[in-house]
Every structure is written in structure tokens, then in C-alpha cells.
A protein has these predicted regions:
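An acidic/histidine-cluster motif and surrounding catalytic segment
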Residues: 1-62, 66-186
Length: 186
């Protein structure tokens, strides 16, 4: 599966870390240079939409703070439901979710896009609906508008979390403690 990683040009440190993670997993991932904008949220939104617009095959999209917490990536991916549109390999789960099969739960009420796979169908569907200048940050748009509409799944155990680091998006050190939220996958 093709892989893309979103990275700001001035954050070579984050690209170096992410690329090392990909090498350890045996993944070939291309760096996508983030679109610069004075508003960091708009930069993030524009960049996510630009990535979706170039998806022509099933594609893994990572953020540059991704941290793999399991070496079972290919094993878990191979058990994904056949009808998937979007796969989350970790996330901030806000409510209990329904188990579907093997390592996969129906994904609703979940934030974060640090490790997500998209089909071309899902990418097209999102780009037709998402306004990067609108009121939502991309993660929130997916949670509210896309997860209820498409076949979105999240795995347990999580394969990826977000590494604690300074976030250019939030202008502060960010530590999301995502592993704790996987307990909502009953």
C-alpha cells in the first residue's frame, strides 16, 4: 500500500523520527511538504485535503509525530474488513465502539489522523465535502461528518500513537495519551 507522511519543511527533526519509524516497520513512505499558511489549523486542513486529492490507490497517510507501538502492522492490516473506506491505526476514542471482526471496531466519535488509510472512494468523498477554510479542523470534520457516513474502522490493539513533541498546530508540547482511550474498544 502506498504511504505518505505530512511534514512541515522546517520540521526536519520530525521527518527524521517518522522516517526511522517507517524503516523499522518495512514501510516505504513519501514525504509530503505541508502547505504553509499563517493560520496553522488552515495549513493542516489545506495539507490534508491536498493529500486526499492525489490519492488514486489505497493509501496510508501519516502525520510526522507518528509512533509505532506494535510491530503487528501487516498482520492487523491483513484482517481489515473487506468493505473499508477508512482505517485508523490508533486514535482518540471518545465513546465505546462496536466490535466488527478480529482486530477491528466500527470507528465513530474518534479524533486524530496520525495513522489512517484511505480508499480512493473515501478520499474523493471527503474532498468533495471538506472546506479547509471552514469551521472544523480536519480531524473534527472526519469525526462529525465522515465517520457516520463511510465504513470507518479502528484497530485494537492500536498500532500507532502520536509521539510526545512540540506541535506547530497547537503551538505547545502535545501528549495525547491515546493508548488509554483504546479501553473504550470493548
Amino acid at each position: 500500500m502506498k504511504g505518505i507522511c505530512l511534514n512541515l519543511d522546517h520540521r526536519k527533526d520530525r521527518w527524521h523520527h517518522a522516517n526511522n519509524e517507517f524503516i523499522l516497520q518495512g514501510l516505504q513512505v513519501e514525504r509530503f511538504s505541508a502547505i504553509e499558511h499563517e493560520n496553522p489549523l488552515t495549513s493542516f486542513n489545506l495539507s490534508q485535503k491536498a493529500i486526499l486529492q492525489i490519492i488514486t490507490e489505497n493509501t496510508l497517510v501519516f502525520e510526522d509525530d507518528v509512533l509505532f507501538v506494535s510491530h503487528r502492522f501487516n498482520e492487523v492490516l491483513s484482517t481489515a474488513p473487506g468493505d473499508w473506506d477508512i482505517l485508523y491505526f490508533g486514535g482518540n476514542v471518545l465513546e465505546s465502539l462496536q466490535h466488527v471482526k478480529d482486530h477491528w471496531w466500527r470507528c465513530l466519535h474518534t479524533w486524530t489522523t496520525h495513522a489512517v488509510a484511505y480508499t480512493p472512494k473515501a478520499a474523493k468523498y471527503i474532498t468533495e465535502r471538506f472546506d479547509p477554510y471552514g469551521p472544523f479542523v480536519y480531524d473534527d470534520f472526519l469525526k462529525n461528518q465522515i465517520q457516520p457516513e463511510l465504513k470507518c474502522y479502528i484497530c485494537k490493539p492500536f498500532i500507532c500513537v502520536q509521539r510526545e513533541s512540540y506541535s506547530d498546530l497547537w503551538k505547545q508540547n502535545a501528549f495525547y495519551q491515546l493508548l488509554e482511550t483504546q479501553n473504550k474498544l470493548l
